[in-house]
């Protein structure tokens, strides 16, 4: 069982992929209040869940601190057409104050949309209703199979109940103000027959008011993610060719564009540290994955992930070299 580490307000929320806030230069700000997940999906790109063999720590951020820092980014980017996307490297539904978080974000001037990604495995009607009243505008629901046996296999979780998830879909569509985007991961050779079923179900249930109702995702292999035995990622050409076939067959939009979600470029927070730059840091906690540590820059303006750091104790001060800095997600190694 991974340890749960609470991120104090002395630890910047910009810099670490596992928690906090991510700005990728658009009007979307990713919000990551917690890293835990109840499922251990066999294709998970972030190796989440209780069966993870590479995670050593899970993180949780106090919701007041998260909202305070989020508002600063909104002010920097411009108080208009901002989307707060609660996505995490786990499942946001595990965050104890998810309703309070949605409510607080919805009250920030300039925030137009609050969306959330979830498998819905622990969602219930009471929580869905509360999220709707709090201001949640869209749920991106990861639904990868309708066949119960295959759904359990993909989730690698025997208690996962896809029929319950489908019932929740119906409730969301019929009884809440939340738009539903169904977002299956298509794993070639594994759930090929399930994707058309999911398309039919979504066409029947969902009439999204403001967004597309389907967003089929391409299975990819990630450095730290789980690899599905026997599954090989398609080329992007083959993937989009098949989406167009399904579009014609089911008369539904499947090839999506950022504009479909109102996504546009917006000024990005400066990246203060360049690749290969030497930086002084202080180790403040355990890292997300094994052999990592969580560190903060000497200036206190960014968090970073310190790799190859299993022997470095918490509290240590040292020089490190930045090896990655895209979108202010900083990875460094000891010098």
Give the ranges of each region predicted by the language model.
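N-terminal [4Fe-4S]-dependent radical SAM core
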Residues: 1-33, 48-57, 72-78
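Local cysteine-cluster metal-coordination motifs and their immediate loop/turn environment
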Residues: 32-48, 294
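Conserved C-terminal portion of the radical SAM core fold
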Residues: 163-228, 238-258
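Structural detector for short beta-strands of small beta-barrel domains
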Residues: 251, 269-288, 316-323
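Short boundary/loop segments of OB/S1/cold-shock single-stranded nucleic-acid-binding domains
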Residues: 252-277, 307-309
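Beta-strand/loop nucleic-acid-binding surfaces
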Residues: 298-314
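OB-fold/S1-family single-stranded nucleic acid-binding modules
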Residues: 327-335
């Amino acid at each position: 069982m991974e340890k749960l580490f609470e991120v104090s307000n002395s630890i910047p929320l910009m810099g670490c992929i596992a928690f906090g806030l991510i700005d990728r230069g658009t009007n979307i700000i990713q919000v990551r209040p917690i890293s835990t997940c109840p499922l251990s999906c066999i294709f998970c790109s972030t190796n989440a869940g209780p069966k993870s063999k590479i995670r050593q720590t899970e993180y949780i951020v106090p919701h007041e601190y998260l909202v305070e820092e989020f508002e600063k980014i909104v002010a920097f980017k411009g108080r208009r057409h901002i989307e707060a996307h609660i996505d995490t490297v786990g499942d946001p539904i595990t965050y104890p104050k998810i309703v309070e978080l949605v409510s607080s974000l919805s009250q920030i001037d300039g925030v137009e949309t609050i969306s959330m990604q979830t498998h819905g495995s622990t969602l219930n009607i009471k929580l869905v209703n509360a999220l709707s009243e709090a201001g949640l505008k869209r749920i991106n629901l990861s639904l990868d199979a309708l066949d119960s046996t295959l759904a359990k296999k993909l989730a690698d979780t025997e208690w996962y109940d896809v029929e319950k998830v489908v019932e929740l879909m119906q409730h969301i569509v019929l009884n809440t103000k939340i738009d539903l985007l169904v977002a299956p991961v298509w794993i070639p050779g594994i759930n090929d027959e399930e994707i058309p079923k999911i398309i039919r179900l979504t066409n029947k249930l969902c009439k999204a008011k403001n967004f597309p109702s389907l967003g089929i995702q391409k299975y990819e292999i990630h450095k730290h993610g789980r690899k599905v035995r026997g599954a090989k990622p398609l080329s992007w050409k083959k993937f989009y060719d098949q989406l167009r076939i399904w579009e014609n067959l089911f008369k539904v939009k499947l090839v999506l564009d950022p504009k479909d979600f109102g996504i546009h470029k917006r000024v990005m927070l400066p990246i203060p540290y360049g690749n290969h730059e030497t930086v002084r840091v202080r180790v403040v906690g355990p890292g997300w994955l094994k052999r990592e540590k969580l560190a903060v820059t000497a200036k206190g303006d960014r968090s970073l992930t310190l790799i190859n750091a299993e022997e470095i104790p918490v509290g240590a001060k040292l020089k490190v070299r930045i090896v990655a800095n895209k979108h202010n997600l900083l990875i460094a190694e000891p010098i």
